């Protein structure tokens, strides 16, 4: 900004000098000697001539003089060829000075225009600098806020991971325990091999006791391994494509070894026929099935097969029915008091999905909603024989906002939708009566899930997705403590 200001100062100083010079010098230049004729006192005219140049071409000359009858003087003069001003040296100087002043004035105008242009440029630059300074401050503040958010996110992540440190230590201890089991089994195998070679080397009762003890410990370990916290869901495997957009299919988690029957129920209301396939292979590759007719049509897609019986919600009611698939007889009915039905509190996809029956490692469950709980999800643990409610938990999650739900190890997991992008984002732990929001990706391959149930035997999720029967493997995080074995 200093260069344009210096130019302005030079212009102002030059103008002041010119003004001062003109006020002092020009009057003396303008006051030139003139030629005049004056009348003498007494009425006679005297001829008076000023100082004139001697050159006749540059001065006035008296040609003749006389008096008239009244005594007035009459003179005849000859004018010079050119005016006196044009030939006067001082007049030339004045003209030259005026020309210089005009030139300087023009230069000053040019300089002033340039100065004004520079001043405008400087003002523009000043505004740009102010704008850049403001933007820099904004960027600096935004950077600080961004760093603060990153710091908070990292701190939250650290706070989330810090409790896992002792868990990892326990997990390492559990790994050592499993390794110890493996070594004991190897030792027993070696002992049995030696015993087989040398009968009588060891006391049989003592050896049998050691084997039984190890079996109990291994069984307890396997039971602990069966439960855990859900940490991941695999991509779906499409088993079959059949039926309408809505339905359910399942296997019996308590079926004896070798019983691999599959149960298939198409539709969500006003249907009574259940298909039975001999095995998963038959279900995948053939249409050979046995049909069972239920005494009442079912409602929704929340049916389960558990220990040889099918449990379902009777259409347009809050009644649960236990139906024996072998004898084809109703073993028990029970009303879920206050439970909504007939599309009062369904899942987000609708379909009379008011009451959803589930099974996990702990037994039989019912998930529904009531007016008393403002339409939010209610979880009830049921006796699988009598259908009596053993315990109930009221959650704060609206059932109409849930896409689907399933239970693993006593924890209810809820998806945020049934179509498009889906994830598991809510979990309620019944053992602690607490909940948390989670973020577990869930691939919704066919964009319309109407049934999602967990099978503790297969440790897999069974889903009905827009006429496709699919399976998902689950990943559970296990913690086994040695004092629990």
Swiss-Prot record:
Expressed in the brain cortex, olfactory bulb and vomeronasal neuroepithelium (at protein level). Detected in brain cortex, hippocampus, dorsal root ganglion and olfactory bulb. This is Noelin. Its main location: secreted. GO terms for molecular function: amyloid-beta binding; identical protein binding. Residues 226-478 form the Olfactomedin-like domain. InterPro entries: Noelin_dom, Olfac-like_dom, Olfactomedin-like_domain, Quino_amine_DH_bsu. Homotetramer; disulfide-linked. Dimer of dimers, giving rise to a V-shaped homotretramer. Isoform 1 and isoform 3 interact with RTN4R. Identified in a complex with RTN4R and LINGO1. Peripherally associated with AMPAR complex. AMPAR complex consists of an inner core made of 4 pore-forming GluA/GRIA proteins (GRIA1, GRIA2, GRIA3 and GRIA4) and 4 major auxiliary subunits arranged in a twofold symmetry. One of the two pairs of distinct binding sites is occupied either by CNIH2, CNIH3 or CACNG2, CACNG3. The other harbors CACNG2, CACNG3, CACNG4, CACNG8 or GSG1L. One of its GO terms (cellular component) is extrinsic component of postsynaptic density membrane. Transmembrane segments: none annotated. Disulfide bonds join 227-409. Residues 87-227 form a coiled coil. Contributes to the regulation of axonal growth in the embryonic and adult central nervous system by inhibiting interactions between RTN4R and LINGO1. Inhibits RTN4R-mediated axon growth cone collapse. May play an important role in regulating the production of neural crest cells by the neural tube. May be required for normal responses to olfactory stimuli. Disruption phenotype: Females have slightly lower body weight than wild-type at birth, but strongly reduced body weight one to eight weeks after birth. Mutant females do not display normal estrus cycle responses to male odor, and have very low fertility due to a strongly decreased rate of ovulation and a low mating rate. The protein structure is stabilized by calcium ions. It is found in: Secreted; Synapse; Endoplasmic reticulum; Cell projection, Axon. A motif (Endoplasmic reticulum retention signal) lies at residues 482-485. Residues 1-16 form the signal peptide. The keyword Coiled coil applies. The keyword Phosphoprotein does not apply. GO terms for biological process: atrioventricular valve formation; cardiac epithelial to mesenchymal transition; negative regulation of amyloid-beta formation; negative regulation of gene expression; neuronal signal transduction; positive regulation of apoptotic process; positive regulation of epithelial to mesenchymal transition; positive regulation of gene expression. Keywords: Cell projection, Coiled coil, Developmental protein, Disulfide bond, Endoplasmic reticulum, Glycoprotein, Secreted, Signal, Synapse.
């Amino acid at each position: 900004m200093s260069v344009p200001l210096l130019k302005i100062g030079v212009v102002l100083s030059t103008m002041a000098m010119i003004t001062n010079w003109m006020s002092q010098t020009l009057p003396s230049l303008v006051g030139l000697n003139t030629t005049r004729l004056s009348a003498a006192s007494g009425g006679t005219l005297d001829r008076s001539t000023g100082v004139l140049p001697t050159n006749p071409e540059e001065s006035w000359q008296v040609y003749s003089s006389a008096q008239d009858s009244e005594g007035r003087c009459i003179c005849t003069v000859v004018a010079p060829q050119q005016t006196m001003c044009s030939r006067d040296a001082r007049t030339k100087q004045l003209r030259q000075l005026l020309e210089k002043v005009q030139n300087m004035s023009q230069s000053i105008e040019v300089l002033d225009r340039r100065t004004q242009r520079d001043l405008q440029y400087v003002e523009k630059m000043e505004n740009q600098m102010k704008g850049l300074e403001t933007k820099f401050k904004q960027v600096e503040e935004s950077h600080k806020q961004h760093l603060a958010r990153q710091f908070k996110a990292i701190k939250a992540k650290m706070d989330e991971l810090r409790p896992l440190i002792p868990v990892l230590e326990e997990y390492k201890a559990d790994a050592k325990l499993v390794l110890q089991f493996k070594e004991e089994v190897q030792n027993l195998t070696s002992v049995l091999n030696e015993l087989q070679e040398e009968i009588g080397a060891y006391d049989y009762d003592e050896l049998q006791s050691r084997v039984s003890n190890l079996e109990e410990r291994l069984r307890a370990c396997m039971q602990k391994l069966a439960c855990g916290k859900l940490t991941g869901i695999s991509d779906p495997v499409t088993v079959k494509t059949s039926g309408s957009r809505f339905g359910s299919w399942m296997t019996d988690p308590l079926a004896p070894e070798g019983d691999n029957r599959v149960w298939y129920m198409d539709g969500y209301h006003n249907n009574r026929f259940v298909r039975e396939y001999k095995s998963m292979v038959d279900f995948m590759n053939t249409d050979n099935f046995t049909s069972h007719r239920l005494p009442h049509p079912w409602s929704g897609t929340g049916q389960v097969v558990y220990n040889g019986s099918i449990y379902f919600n009777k259409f347009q009611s809050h009644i649960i029915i236990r139906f024996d698939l072998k004898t084809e007889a109703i073993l028990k009915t029970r009303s879920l008091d206050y439970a909504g039905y007939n599309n009062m509190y369904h899942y987000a996809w609708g379909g009379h999905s008011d009451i959803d029956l589930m099974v996990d490692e702990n037994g039989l469950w019912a998930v529904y909603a009531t007016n008393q709980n403002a339409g939010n999800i209610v979880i009830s643990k049921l006796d699988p024989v009598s259908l009596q409610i053993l315990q109930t938990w009221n959650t704060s999650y609206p059932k109409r906002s849930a896409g689907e739900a399933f239970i693993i190890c006593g924890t209810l997991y809820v998806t945020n939708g049934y179509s498009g992008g889906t994830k598991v984002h809510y979990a309620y732990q019944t053992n602690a009566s607490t909940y948390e929001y989670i973020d577990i990706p869930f691939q919704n391959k066919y964009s319309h899930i109407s049934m999602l149930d967990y099978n503790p035997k297969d440790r897999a999720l069974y889903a009905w997705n827009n006429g496709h029967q699919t399976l998902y493997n689950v990943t559970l995080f296990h913690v086994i403590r040695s004092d629990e074995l």
